[in-house]
């Protein structure tokens, strides 16, 4: 990786950590807003500019794509491809930082495209032992769209979601009848996934192994009822939702809480402080506690971030007040943990091996 990309990636991850999720609204008048908010008003794209998800070029990962980033595994991990795989639909987080538009191009290329592949490689790969992985390109809302509660920002997020929904419909249409479905997303991707669970509730009935809605807060009583799905309370439960947000001690999630508590779900229900969903990915239980020896592998990136090794049995975690608090011997993951000890960027990497085992276990239970 060239030095320019490396430095730009640090800048990107730093912004995501400081301003990710609901926390970014706290910086409305700050330098961050001036630096990142898209210039001008939102302008709807031409109807003909939308993606065609019948084309392989509209996907970052799907069966048959050469140099598929979702097929990656860290050194020392052996993957046995399932003879009758499930299908995973994965939605990547924000990777577009420029201010020239409210939504990225379908294939933004350059650093934004590189970062999207990096997230598919490090996150979606956790599901590749049991499933084909489909990861769409989509006209993601630019990072700055999260900095404002404005009509323009809402329109940008809605456009991104419409692409995701269209991609999901194409994904589902391509699956043989009865194929088990796994859903996963992170940050902006998790936000879109939370909407998809509502809009495609009927299509998912009887087919969903689990939904991994990671790095975006969910209320059990305000958000989940509209999906018709329960939280995953046990490691072999299926047709349920997992969600977590990772912090280390001393944790200070006030930036997330200040904007989330009291906000309302799509159905108008107020979100309450004591109702945030936390699943422990180490044991698959809601509000669970797990010691470091139960962690089947943390991804530790190499110097240029192009690959990673697995560190087993080093990081434990417990759910506390709706957040996942990590402990143990956290390996050096990079300089991206910022104020509040928020490990947002590492929500998947910290537990990669255990997420891999979790989905294998739930799929086995689904097929039993």
Regions found by a protein language model. Give the residues of each.
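Loop/turn elements at helix/coil->beta-strand transitions in domains of secreted/extracellular proteins
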Residues: 84-86, 129-133, 177-180, 206-210
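Structural recognition of the beta-strand scaffold that forms the well-ordered cores
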Residues: 87-90, 134-137, 182, 210-213, ...
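Hydrophobic membrane-insertion alpha-helices, especially the h-region
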Residues: 7-24
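Extracytoplasmic/periplasmic/luminal assembly and interaction segments
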Residues: 60-98
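Short extracytoplasmic
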Residues: 42-71
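Active-site catalytic motif of lipid deacylating hydrolases and related acyltransferases
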Residues: 27-48, 53, 91-179, 327-368
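Gly/Ala-rich beta-loop-alpha elbow adjacent to hydrolase catalytic centers
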Residues: 183-193
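Surface cap/lid and interfacial helix-loop subdomains adjacent to catalytic sites
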Residues: 2-9, 37, 165-177, 198-336, ...
């Amino acid at each position: 990786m060239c030095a320019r990309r490396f430095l730009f990636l640090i800048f990107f991850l730093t912004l995501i950590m400081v301003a990710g999720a609901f926390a970014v609204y706290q910086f409305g008048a700050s330098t961050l807003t001036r630096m990142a908010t898209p210039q001008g008003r939102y302008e709807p794209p031409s109807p003909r500019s939308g993606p065609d998800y019948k084309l392989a070029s509209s996907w970052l990962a799907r069966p048959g794509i050469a140099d598929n980033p979702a097929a990656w595994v860290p050194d020392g991990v052996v993957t046995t491809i399932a003879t009758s795989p499930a299908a995973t639909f994965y939605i990547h987080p924000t990777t577009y930082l420029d201010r020239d538009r409210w939504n990225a191009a379908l294939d933004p290329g350059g650093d934004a495209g590189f970062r999207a592949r990096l997230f598919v490689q490090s996150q979606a790969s956790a599901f590749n032992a049991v499933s084909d992985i489909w990861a769409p390109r989509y006209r993601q809302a630019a990072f700055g769209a999260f900095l404002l509660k404005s009509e323009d920002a809402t329109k940008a997020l809605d456009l991104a979601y419409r692409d995701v929904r269209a991609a999901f419909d194409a994904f589902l249409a391509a699956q043989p009848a009865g194929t088990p479905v796994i859903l996963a997303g992170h940050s902006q991707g998790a936000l879109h996934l939370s909407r998809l669970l509502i809009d495609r509730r009927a299509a998912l009935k009887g087919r969903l192994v689990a939904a991994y809605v990671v790095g975006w807060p969910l209320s059990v009583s305000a958000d989940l009822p509209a999906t018709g799905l329960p939280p995953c309370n046990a490691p072999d439960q299926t047709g349920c939702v997992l969600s977590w947000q990772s912090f280390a001690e001393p944790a200070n999630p006030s930036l997330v809480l200040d904007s989330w508590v009291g906000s309302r779900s799509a159905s108008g229900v107020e979100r309450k402080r004591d109702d945030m969903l936390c699943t422990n990915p180490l044991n698959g239980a809601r509000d669970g506690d797990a010691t470091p020896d139960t962690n089947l592998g943390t991804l530790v990136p190499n110097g240029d971030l192009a690959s990673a090794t697995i560190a087993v049995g080093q990081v434990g975690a417990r759910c506390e007040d709706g957040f996942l608090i990590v402990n143990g011997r956290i390996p050096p993951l990079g300089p991206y943990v910022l104020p509040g000890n928020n490990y947002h960027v590492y929500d998947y990497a910290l537990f990669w091996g255990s997420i891999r085992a979790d989905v294998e276990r739930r799929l086995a239970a689904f097929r039993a």
